[in-house]
Amino acid sequence: MSQCLINDELIKEEFPACSRGTWFATGIVGIMPKSAAKVLADAVLRFETEVFYNYQELDSAVETLRRRLASLISAENVTDICFTRNATEGIIIGVSNIEFESGDEIVTSNQEHGALLDRLTYIERRGRAKLRMFEISKEPEETLESVKKQVSRRTKLLAFSHVSCQTGIRLPAKEICEVGRKVGAYILIDGAQTVGNIPVNVRDYECDFYAANGHKWLCGPKGTSFLYVNPDSAITLSPTFLAFGSSSDDLATRRNAMRFEYGTREKILLFGLLAVIDLYAKWDWELKDGRIKELSAYLRERLNEIPKCIVHTPMDWDKSSGNTSFSVEGYSLEKVSGYLSNEWRIMTRSVPEINAIRISTSYFNTNKEIDRLIEALKAL
């Protein structure tokens, strides 16, 4: 393992829950570091009880966070970022601001989360566009070829997950976006499983929307997420919702992502996400990310030791992520999941689409926890 400040002592101090069980479900929701949670709790107490609390301090923290997140995903402008409650909300904002006409088509993948798929299916059922699907493969070249077969001049929207929530496969986002741009399609990327897990560079992708979470791999407070909106798209799209906050001081609609922020919001939660981001800067982002990479590789190597385990995630890090999915021959996912949680206190995520278990190896997990998982599977 990398010589990182994130060691056993730090994990014990910052993540006390890890002493009571193993949390391999960061892809569902992350565990917030204790010191960052305390910063949030103190801020909530002060904000909600002190009449003379300085709102400028809170607003300043929110804008600092906006700058940090823009930098984290390599956005060109700070104003390309708007805050949402979750990636699902970001997806809805993106899709809802596209006007579909008869004959339009939407292209997505065969491994999408309901956050995106349910919305796209609804559009198709209303007769507004036809839904087409490309197949995700372990090999990016094969995935790309499938995309090319589905995309055409009729494609109004190309929407896909950067990392599959089912298999943990990392899609070739840049190349897929190039295919979409050639036919003039809007491009939306579901980044629910990426930010805090793998590097993200939206300028490289040139997508119109990139929806991300703050509460999964970033391990921030629940209800903190954000949406990247390409500045060119923000100008041309007609917002579905406009209200107080969507306009600048002269009442003109904002010409950037911030037009999608309106009404009273729980800004105080963003104070907590900023505390987490600051903590990662202190620990070193690269070492944190390197730890996820090394733990994921170690997990897959150990799983391959068990003949009855079928790993659905590529070994190559450039083709995968911190999510690893596997099936156990002869056992249903309900049997395996229940066995791990009830008898070993190992929490995972079920993937019913492929009868698999998904393991999310975050930076606070350890080799010992992986060894214990392997021990449990061998005893099954």
Question: Predicted segments — roles?
Answer:
Residues M1-L380:
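Pyridoxal 5′-phosphate
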